Every structure is written in C-alpha cells, then in structure tokens.
Design a protein with these regions (language model features):
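Post-transcriptional modification and biogenesis factors for structured RNAs
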Residues: 1-147
Length: 147
C-alpha cells in the first residue's frame, strides 16, 4: 500500500521541514510514501481525476469537522486498508479556509485531530506522526507505549 500525504502550500519552516523528513523516513519502513506540496485545492481534485491506477486512491481529508480517532483507531484504519487491498491512501491537509463542498464530496473519509485549530504546517507533522504511530502499533513496536 502506498501513502501519499498532500498539503496546500509550501513548507517554509526549517524545523517543520526537518520533522516532515524524519517522519517520512520512518514511515518508509512500513509503506511506500510520498509528500506532495500542492498549489491549490483544485490541484488536488485534478490529481484525483488524472489517476491512472486500477483503483482510485482512497482520499482522506483532514478537517476540523471530521471524525476523531484514537491512535489505535488510526492503526485499525491502516490495517483495514492494507488487508483489503487498498493500493493508495491519499491523506490531504486542507487550505487555511477549509475544504470546499466539492472536495469533501470526493473524499472517502474526513478525519479531525479534535476541536482545536492547528497551524497547517503543524497539522502535517501531527498527521505523519500519527500514521507512523499507527504502523508501530500494528507491528508491536515499543514506540507506542500505550496512553
């Protein structure tokens, strides 16, 4: 299964760039992964339309109005998609003004990190860390020590 993590806009903060690179490296032990810096929400929709894969990617949006999952539930989500043959999970952190109705309608799942508002660059790192944590839970790695 391939993971693609997309976000709108460039990452300008060196510490965020460093954390992003570190978690992408860690994730690559468990799945092929790729980060995508997109210029706009429209670019994400075009990316979905142009997909040439046998099956389209499963689009998971991050949005404050989405479903809140525990780390264990994220692990179960990843496990479900691995065991059911999902070829690609495409996670997307939205633009500052939120996702449009069209993009929300195109999504297979909308997730949230809670009712708090995070800077978009920080939300990217939290997403990458939670995906990594999810895989370590599945593999019984000591990174996730419980609560």
């Amino acid at each position: 299964m391939k993971l693609r993590i997309a976000w709108i806009g460039r990452t300008r903060s060196p510490p965020i760039q460093s954390l992003t690179a570190e978690y992408l490296k860690r994730l690559s032990r468990y799945a092929a992964c790729e980060a995508l810096e997109l210029m706009s929400e429209a670019t994400l929709l075009r990316l979905l339309e142009k997909s040439t894969a046998r099956t389209p990617p499963v689009l998971v949006l991050l949005d404050s109005r989405g479903l809140q999952l525990t780390s264990e539930e994220i692990a179960n989500f990843l496990d479900y998609h691995q065991s059911h043959g999902t070829q690609e999970l495409l996670f997307a952190v939205g633009p500052a003004d939120g996702w449009s109705a069209d993009t929300r309608a195109a999504a297979n799942q909308v997730l949230s990190f809670g009712k708090i508002t995070l800077p978009h660059e920080l939300a990217r790192v939290v997403l990458l860390e939670q995906l990594y944590r999810g895989f370590t839970i599945l593999k019984g790695h000591p990174y996730h020590g419980g609560h």
